UniProtKB/Swiss-Prot annotation:
This is 2-C-methyl-D-erythritol 4-phosphate cytidylyltransferase. Pathway: Isoprenoid biosynthesis; isopentenyl diphosphate biosynthesis via DXP pathway; isopentenyl diphosphate from 1-deoxy-D-xylulose 5-phosphate: step 2/6. It comes from the Bacteria. The record marks 162, 214 as: Positions MEP for the nucleophilic attack. Pfam families: IspD. The keyword Acyltransferase does not apply. The record marks 20, 27 as: Transition state stabilizer. Disulfide bonds: none annotated. Catalyzes the formation of 4-diphosphocytidyl-2-C-methyl-D-erythritol from CTP and 2-C-methyl-D-erythritol 4-phosphate (MEP). The keyword Nucleotidyltransferase applies. The lineage of its organism: Bacteria, Pseudomonadati, Pseudomonadota, Betaproteobacteria, Rhodocyclales. PROSITE patterns: ISPD (PS01295).
Amino acid sequence: MQNFQPRHFAIVPAAGSGSRMATSRPKQYLPLLGKPLIFHSLAVLCAAPDVDKVFVVLSVEDAEWRRHDWSVLGPKLVPLFCGGGTRADSVLAGLRAVADEIEPSDWVLVHDAARPCLAPWHIEKLARELARDEVGGLLAVPVADTLKRADEHRQVLATVPRENLWQAQTPQMFRHVMLRRALEAATNATDEASAIEAAGLHPRLVESDATNLKVTYPLDLHLAEWILTNRGS
């Protein structure tokens, strides 16, 4: 009997507007080293030997995508114009759109469009450490700063012990059918791991590093540029 080897597919939800960047252009298209911000992580995903296809979930009204040349990334890259109003909506819409291409036990890696500093080793480590995991997991880094819990007036109520606290990153990697069912049941989930948690399961944390940052504010764009420019030097 032939053993079935699960494949890996990436989904990048990119239907958001990035309002905290205070720009008229969607955040994923802001220029970074001469390319759209999203280009950099797509290039790494498309070049990953273990990733079969990379699906980018875009807004139905996205007119910016076609203004750029993505052909250099090769045939793995597939745009899907079916994005929803939230991250969870977009990921679920993407999963439904490609349901015929992905087997139930295949792995799906969901990556933030606004994390341009993804490196090949991030993907390799995630896939390696989760290969035999029954649930899946996500890249994350231990919380380094002291955390405070406050009230609505920003008065400190308590200091939160940071032991065993982690900051979630992406990619987040789960089995296709498990992820789809979890998102269908938890439509308000802020990330895939929280949807899996809501289903009563326990994702595994795979330690990453601070270079895999999410561009949220204008200063983050400069930091991402520095990381990409100095990577490997």
